[in-house]
Swiss-Prot record:
Protein name, as recorded: Nucleoid-associated protein plu2870
Source taxon at top rank: Bacteria
Source organism: Photorhabdus laumondii subsp. laumondii (strain DSM 15139 / CIP 105565 / TT01)
GO function terms (MF aspect): double-stranded DNA binding; single-stranded RNA binding
NCBIfam families: PRK00378.1
Family as reported in the entry's similarity comment: Belongs to the YejK family.
Pfam families for the chain: NA37 (PF04245)
Amino acid sequence: MSLQIDQIALHQLIKRDEQTLDVVLRDSLLATDQVVEDMMAELHRVYSAKSKAYGLFNEESELAEALRHQRKGDEDFLGFSRAATARLRDELAKYPFAEGGTVLFCQYRYLAVEYLLIAVLNSCNSMSVNDNLDLNTTHYLDIPHADIVARIDLTEWETNPESSRYLTFLKGRVGRKVSDFFMDFLAASEGMNAKVQNKGLLQAVDDYCESGELNKDERQAYRQQVYNYCNEQLQAGEEIEIKALSQALPTFGEQNFQQFSQEQEYELEESFPADRSTLRQLTKFAGSGGGLTINFDAMLFGERIFWDPATDTLTIKGTPPNLRDQLQRRSSGH
């Protein structure tokens, strides 16, 4: 992994009681050794694999202003991180889920892109066995379950300040509260919505198929091609690029897919992250509610599975063997 750490600082937030969240500030930057490199590689991997929300700084963002000064050399990275940690404490203390933790600020490069990552990491206790086969207690950072993390694409921010996607943050296990916390701390507003972009892509695909007057099988084959490209990008950790997608798809009429989507004003970005749950709709139908969960391949619709909109009735011809076995057992009273 070509990850190069430029500067990294650690501080700590300690919850003394329900009303007090203390801050402990480090007096020097963390030395970059193999342990630190391994930790950042793991944190980068975990962060990259999780679902993220996008944002951009508000004009009055204190963090953005402080970061600009730090980037210009008016303040060193340690001083920037110490002041930011104090602001972080003030914002986090407003929320009932505040538990403290290790605060990490890391400026690093990955694949020619410069990032600033900010995280609050929880610590966990575990046990290890030493050479004498005795048990020892160990304390470790719970990086795999990190959910209070934000990252600024410094390269994008400085070269394209009008961008709506240079700032990302995790949605977190406590949902909207974490989003609110990061918005307050960063003084940022919501930017590009990846799920909306993916939904727009699906609508554009359906409309393009309709313009090409494709039959049912042809439409599903086209959707499958779109899904294959998008899934490959997702697995590779790359974004969906409309131009590349268009080049991989057949053209109907005088316009290729990219030209069609631009003319119809779907407001699709040139590239955007793939959203797994949305893209799955290209090849599957799925839904749940009222104690019922249904999931089936789209190609079965109209062949083995039929829907009557007048009565809202779904008819399935041929059930899976394991389901059929359960139904037979229950019907016979076993």
